């Protein structure tokens, strides 16, 4: 795309997609986020966010969005989900003092995989504040919000996991539930979105759908039989995949499954975690998706014209991460960035071809047609969206007036968030696996049990109410209907984009603790 074609209407220009529907897109970025450093040899590199931003600037995409520098999430906001003692630890620990806190490091799973980095608490505040800020924007006229620094889906209520310290996704969903009866979470990272699923496993107001590598692979969760518990039964969907899945095979599952989920669940908002470690050639991944194949998930979810929060996640071949999230920003805007890459600050990273797209490899696709058919068959059971009544709503987050004439859009700030929250009981330590050791046996020991429906519920969650206690409760839902989610073959899938009425019929939602 020629940067000159981006338009001269400032950074509040609504974009028009292929479906003819206008989208108001906002984008959250803190220029300091690229300075955080996990340590020498660590695969997680926040520098990839700065690389992505540089590409967005050179492609002229920033001019088509409202760009905000996020306000850091405050302690009480973080404690809407996380245990206060855990947040206090993240705030106080430093590389210099960590040796004096060995017991707490072990308790909260902070160490080699999730190291104590300089400015750890500020880092968490930054990416969490951006995700919550994006959720707030949906209440003020925006259709799509983007935070590529977010999407850290492994963090638990009181422990770090898989390079993730604070679960910005859960915090954003809790914000969305103030105004939306049902919220859908979709995860296309190669790793199972265990932290988000766990947070909403027993409620029917949030539904989680995760497409991930399953087997001897971190975090070892996400069995197709894990479907939610109690009120949340059938509100967790897991799509376990094998090595080498390509664009065609992936979309043969993604579109029919998500088309049926949107039809049956009817969410008021969608959160899409766009982990780029599912791309071909990722340092820690084993899938074979092209950037266009990965972005097709964004394009498809965008077409429903439901408020859409796009978040980052995994991705460890950082030049491809930047390529992917730049292209997906273009998709969100209804644009098609040209393949030839403009000269930019990190141009040398993208040699020798200097293109936005890279060809997938010729690796074997171990996902057979029979396996894909079996997955569709097993997932073809989903109850209809339940009706829901709100408890007293949490006060709206107030947004001060923005200065539309401010010269530098990167200096804009999103509004202060003033989320009043209930404290939640901390859960016990969960079984820990390492994301750095990819081949990990999956076992069911004393800390897990299988309930009658085949769903797996960690022992610390048995008998607990949903961890997000302030999200309301549903009225008695209808019995599960075996025919409610008969997933069609991909050739039969047709998505009729909804109008700006944003999918009518909102009710309860579901998810894991």
Swiss-Prot record:
Protein name (Swiss-Prot/TrEMBL): Probable histone deacetylase 19
Annotated compartments: Nucleus
Cofactor(s) it depends on: Zn(2+)
Cellular component terms per the entry's GO annotation: nucleus
Sequence ranges of Acidic residues compositional bias: 398-409
Keyword Transcription: yes
Main location: nucleus
Disordered: region residues: 384-432, 446-513
Annotated segments matching region Histone deacetylase: 23-334
Transcription regulation keyword on record: yes
Binding site for Zn(2+): 189, 191, 277
Reaction(s) this enzyme catalyzes, per UniProt: N(6)-acetyl-L-lysyl-[histone] + H2O = L-lysyl-[histone] + acetate
Cofactor binding note of this UniProt entry: Binds 1 zinc ion per subunit.
Protein role: Responsible for the deacetylation of lysine residues on the N-terminal part of the core histones (H2A, H2B, H3 and H4). Histone deacetylation gives a tag for epigenetic repression and plays an important role in transcriptional regulation, cell cycle progression and developmental events. Histone deacetylases act via the formation of large multiprotein complexes.
GO molecular function: histone deacetylase activity; histone deacetylase activity, hydrolytic mechanism; zinc ion binding
Family as reported in the entry's similarity comment: Belongs to the histone deacetylase family. HD type 1 subfamily.
Highest taxon above the source species: Eukaryota
Active site (UniProt): 154
């Amino acid at each position: 795309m020629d940067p000159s074609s981006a338009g001269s209407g400032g950074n509040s220009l609504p974009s028009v997609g292929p479906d003819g529907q206008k989208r108001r897109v906002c984008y959250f970025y803190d220029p300091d986020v690229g300075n955080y450093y996990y340590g020498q040899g660590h695969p997680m590199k926040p520098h990839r966010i700065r690389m992505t931003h540089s590409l967005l600037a050179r492609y002229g995409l920033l001019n088509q969005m409202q760009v905000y520098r996020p306000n850091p999430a405050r302690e009480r906001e973080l404690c809407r989900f996380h245990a206060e003692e855990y947040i206090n630890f993240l705030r106080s620990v430093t590389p210099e003092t960590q040796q004096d806190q060995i017991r707490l490091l072990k308790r909260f799973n902070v160490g080699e995989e999730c190291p104590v980095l300089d400015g750890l608490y500020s880092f968490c505040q930054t990416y969490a504040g951006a995700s919550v800020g994006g959720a707030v924007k949906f209440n003020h006229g925006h259709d799509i919000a983007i935070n590529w620094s977010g999407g850290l889906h492994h963090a638990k209520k009181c422990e770090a996991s898989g390079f993730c310290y604070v679960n910005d996704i859960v915090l954003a969903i809790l914000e969305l539930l103030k105004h939306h009866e049902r919220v859908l979470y979709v995860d296309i990272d190669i790793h199972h979105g265990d932290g988000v699923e766990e947070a909403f496993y027993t409620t029917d107001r949030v539904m989680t759908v995760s497409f991930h590598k399953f087997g001897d692979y971190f975090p070892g969760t996400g069995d197709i039989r894990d479907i939610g518990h109690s009120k949340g039964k059938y509100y967790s969907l897991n799509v376990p995949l094998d090595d080498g899945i390509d664009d065609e095979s992936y979309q043969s599952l993604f579109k029919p499954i998500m088309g049926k989920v949107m039809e049956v669940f009817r969410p008021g908002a969608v959160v899409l975690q766009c982990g780029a470690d599912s791309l071909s050639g990722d340092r820690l991944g084993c899938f074979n998706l092209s950037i266009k194949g990965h972005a097709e998930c964004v394009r498809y979810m965008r077409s429903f014209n439901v408020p859409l929060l796009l978040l980052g996640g995994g991705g460890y071949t950082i030049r491809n991460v930047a390529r992917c999230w730049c292209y997906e920003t273009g998709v969100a805007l209804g644009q098609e960035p040209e393949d030839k890459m403009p000269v930019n600050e990190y141009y040398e990273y993208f040699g020798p071809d200097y293109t936005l797209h890279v060809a997938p490899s010729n690796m074997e696709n171990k996902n057979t047609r029979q396996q894909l058919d079996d997955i569709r068959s097993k997932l073809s059971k989903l109850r209809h969206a339940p009706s829901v009544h709100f408890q007293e709503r949490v006060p709206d987050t107030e947004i001060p007036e923005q200065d539309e004439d401010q010269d530098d859009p990167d200096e804009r700030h999103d509004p202060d968030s003033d989320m009043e929250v209930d404290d939640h009981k901390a859960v016990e330590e969960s079984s820990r696996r390492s994301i750095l050791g990819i081949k990990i046996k999956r076992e069911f020991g004393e800390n897990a049990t299988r309930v009658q429906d085949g769903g797996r519920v960690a022992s610390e969650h048995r008998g607990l109410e949903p961890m997000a206690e302030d999200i309301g409760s549903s009225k008695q839902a209808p019995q599960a209907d075996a025919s409610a989610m008969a997933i069609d073959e991909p050739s039969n899938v047709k998505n009729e984009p909804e109008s700006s009425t944003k999918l009518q019929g909102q009710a309860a939602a579901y998810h894991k603790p």
